[in-house]
Amino acid sequence: MGTDRAAIERPTVDQGALGDCWYLAALMSVQRTDPELLAENISGLGDPPGSEGWEVRLYVDGEWTDVAVDPSDLGAQGTVDASSGEPSWASIYEMAMINAHDGRPSAVSADTPAAGIEMITGERASEYDTVAQPSFEEYKQAIDEGRPVTVMTDPLKPIGPAADDLVAAHVYEVSGYDEATGEIILTNPHGPQSQNPYEVRIDPDHPGYAFSITMTGIGEP
């Protein structure tokens, strides 16, 4: 499978059965903002490249680490390309993250929006909780500056704006904004074939925003 910039820019992430939306949403965000970084940090082993696996650079415990991924590691439960249903570069990155956590999918089933961004980019990400979420203008500025942005929904049940379209305890990529409506656009790692909406629009300046979105992570440009 391709791991160069062109190959990384194309596929659409489909989360699969693992609970690592915090990481996949960050991958999607960096895919949009800096696909070259993703391409640089994955190396195919063997001839042809990838025939003997890959090495992925991730920022783990405060330092860059090369994590090995064997082709046999790419199981049936993980993320795939939503178009083909086959493993993609994101599957390799996902397995690298799991291998960096002792190879146990159960160990990576929950984390914060900022954690995924930091692990992939190696840069500190700002994290905002219900007390002080970004405004529409702040989200817009972050997107315009090319920063990766993800948000997490209420862990029990979103009851604010767009509540019926949001999955509880789930992390979404903030993929864009609509200046005419004052809404940000969230993209769901579950993929376009999911029973849940793939894109959700929500007004971050709505008084009830914090009852739907409880945390935001914003990375460096």
Where are these regions (language model features)?
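Non-catalytic, low-structured ubiquitin/UBL-interacting segments
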Residues: 1-7
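Intrinsically disordered, low-complexity segments enriched in polar/charged residues with Gly/Pro
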Residues: 2, 43-44, 161-164
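Predominantly the structural core of cysteine protease catalytic domains
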Residues: 7-34, 52-177, 185-221
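Surface-exposed patches in mature extracellular/periplasmic domains of secreted proteins
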Residues: 36-46
